[in-house]
From Swiss-Prot:
GO BP annotations, alphabetical order: response to bacterium
Membrane topology qualifier: Multi-pass membrane protein
Identification of the protein by name: Transmembrane protein 255A
Pfam families documented for this protein: FAM70
Organism: Mus musculus
PANTHER family assigned to the protein according to its UniProt record, in alphabetical order: TRANSMEMBRANE PROTEIN 255A, TRANSMEMBRANE PROTEIN 255B-LIKE
Region (Disordered): 302-331
Top-level taxon in the UniProt lineage: Eukaryota
Transmembrane segments: 30-50, 57-77, 89-109, 226-246
Keywords, sorted A to Z: Membrane, Transmembrane, Transmembrane helix
Any GO CC annotation of this UniProt entry: membrane
Family: Belongs to the TMEM255 family.
Subcellular location: Membrane
Length: 351
């Protein structure tokens, strides 16, 4: 009995605990997916800014931002569903897993490129030159003087590009005159007279920039994208783990055991007293005395004889019954109606 009551109490207490655990898991899953969505938007923004900063450097890792953003969006929707929650969360976990792999790869690529292929020492020393875009007439003069013939078809296609010659003094090879286009930041310290095998410092020109300060911005954007991809990597792993634990939880109500009665019933002192209905008195069996009036009236017909072996002297003198305890002879006998259970036919009348 005590064990049954303990089980009932535990089942009663499991209802708020289960609902509280479900709401807590739901709140945590929404928090991590919203945080991952914000980080993925930052990865996408910074990656696109780094990719479109120059024309010849396109290594900004914005692909993980797209994949992680879509996966976190599915996770937010699935966390607020009841019927199709599992399917949406499984799809979210799959996209987040691919986004984690992409973030790992892009973090390595962006970090290695920013560390080994961009040298900011010539930029900080003001040894890089920015070549603005020239007019069409100046470009024709440069091409004509360099080729010493009339402009060809190939030269005419390049008229829209600003072409200039920059003198880069080199101690080992003499004077180099590379030709560069307009809107380009060119660093002579990183250029070895066209010998790409002996390049000492990575990229020496950055095309389609507004100034050489854009290279510094590109360097910072690449490192920012690398850090954000690392953050997205770990946050994606945590989000996938949280969603994986929440996808199988449902707000189901536990079964309550109502077969065991309460051992200590509560008594309400302000409750209205119950009044028995007419049917209760009608169907209840009448309370009859153990003897009827007929027994009292005819008790003198058969007088009790004294037991054998006792003389008149040894017979105990019983006190005479008081008239108050005896039925009077003039009183009518009490009538007790026979009791018949409900739905039972009474016996036939007999005179």
């Amino acid at each position: 009995m005590h064990q049954s009551l303990t089980q009932q109490r535990s089942s009663d207490m499991s209802l708020p605990d289960s609902m509280g655990a479900f709401n807590r898991r739901k709140r945590n899953s929404i928090y991590v997916t919203v945080t991952l969505l914000i980080v993925s938007m930052l990865i996408l923004t910074v990656g696109l800014a780094a990719t479109t900063r120059t024309q010849n450097v396109t290594v900004g890792g914005y692909y993980p931002g797209v994949i992680l953003g879509f996966g976190s969006f599915l996770g937010i929707i699935g966390s607020n569903l009841i019927e199709n929650k599992r399917q949406m969360l499984v799809a979210s976990i799959v996209f987040i897993s691919f986004g984690v792999i992409a973030a790992f790869c892009c973090a390595i690529v962006d970090g290695v490129f920013a560390a080994r292929h961009i040298d900011l020492k010539p930029l900080y020393a003001n040894r890089c030159h920015y070549v603005p875009k020239t007019s069409q007439r100046e470009a024709e003069e440069v091409i004509t003087s360099s080729s010493k013939i009339t402009p060809s078809t190939r030269a005419l296609r390049n008229l829209t590009q600003a072409v200039k010659e920059v003198n880069c003094p080199q101690l080992s090879r003499g004077l180099c005159t590379p030709r560069i286009r307009g809107n380009t930041c060119f660093c002579c310290d990183l250029y070895n007279c066209g010998n790409r095998v002996e390049i000492t410092g990575g990229y020496y020109e950055y095309i389609d920039v507004s100034s050489c300060q854009d290279i510094i911005h590109l360097y910072h954007l690449l490192w920012s994208a690398t850090i954000l991809n690392i953050v997205g990597l770990f946050l994606g792993i945590i989000t996938a783990a949280v969603l994986g634990g929440f996808k199988d939880m449902n707000p189901t109500l536990p079964a309550l055991n109502c077969s065991v009665e309460n051992a200590h019933p509560t008594v309400s002192y302000y409750a209205r007293p119950q009044v028995a209905s007419y049917n209760t008195y009608y169907h209840s069996p009448p309370h009859l005395p153990p003897y009827s009036a007929y027994d009292f009236q005819h008790s003198g017909v058969f007088p009790s004889s004294p037991p054998s072996g006792l003389s008149d002297e040894q017979e105990p003198q019983s006190p005479s019954p008081s008239p108050s305890y005896m039925w009077s002879s003039s009183a009518p006998p009490r009538y007790s109606p026979p009791y018949y259970p409900p739905f039972e036919k009474p016996p036939p009348y007999s005179p």
